Amino acid sequence: TLANMKSAISRLEGQGLSLLKAVNLRASHFYVKFKPADSAQYEQLQTDKRMTIYPYPLDYEIAVRGNRYHDPSLPKGTITYHYAAVKSDYVFDPKIPYEVLSALYIPEEDTSLKSKTSEAYVDQLLNQAYKQTGNFQDTIVAIKANSPQASYHPGGKIQVWDTRLQQYIGLEGVDMRARRWFTTHHARTDFWGNYQMEDTFKNPCNYSLWFSQEDFVVREHLIALTAWIDGPKQKANWNVDISTGYDRFISHVFRGAYRYHYGFIDGLKRPYLPVARLKYIA
């Protein structure tokens, strides 16, 4: 939060590190809970390119991985709350209910802190902020004053089992996400299922796979929300072989839709694209 970052900056100032001043710090983002009333509002949030929304809170560590979450305070069959970090100048749609949970300062996204010295300072700032909130698993073992921590590009390979070919094939076109707290990086898988984020992280990230594209989305038949597969929190690549079950079924529904929209269909007419994305229910 902004308050935690101000406190961390003040601690660093006490150690003689004063690249930023707590008194001058302003919110760069807001952490928001959206409360979509219907599927139209949910789809509007899903396709808003100014943010990345999730159907679960972002300010908690995920204790148990799973592909489903519904806020226990809401009745079954309703759309669960969704969460996102939006920039401080974000203009909200007054028709969609929302609640600002906290003001944020995300130093990794501060373009004024891009020099080598600034990066090392950001490492120390984040280290202090994590310690203050008890997130010791995210602290860095040792930080040198003018030497930033090494970064990495999240990536990996996604494959699905093809029963006709009797082998794994690449799952092309899915939205791969790598998230650290309130920051998300995206990449698309290629024909072979490979993906790599252009942006970097320095600590482990939460991976996830989302069955969505610009022109269509695969929704789950029971809850009608975008289908997704939750991944691990790690610093290494996330490689997945989807072999059986519902995830394999959804993957092949996505493959069929992807080919219908963008691949070779031997003269067939492409699907009609209305204003909204097409929804395929799996």
Q: What positions do the PLM features span?
A:
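Zn2+-dependent metallopeptidase catalytic core
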Residues: 196-200, 210-217, 241-277
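Short, ordered, surface-exposed loop/turn motifs in non-cytosolic proteins
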Residues: 12, 153-182
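Long amphipathic alpha-helical scaffold segments
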Residues: 89-153
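Long, solvent-exposed N-terminal ectodomains/accessory regions
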Residues: 1-117
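A short, solvent-exposed loop/turn motif at the edges and junctions
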Residues: 208-228
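Short, acidic Ser/Thr/Gly-rich low-complexity loop/linker segments typical of extracellular
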Residues: 180-194
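Catalytic zinc-binding patch centered on the HExxH motif and its immediate surroundings
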Residues: 187, 280-282
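A short, Gly/Thr-enriched small/hydrophobic beta-strand-prone motif that recurs across taxa
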Residues: 134-165, 252-265
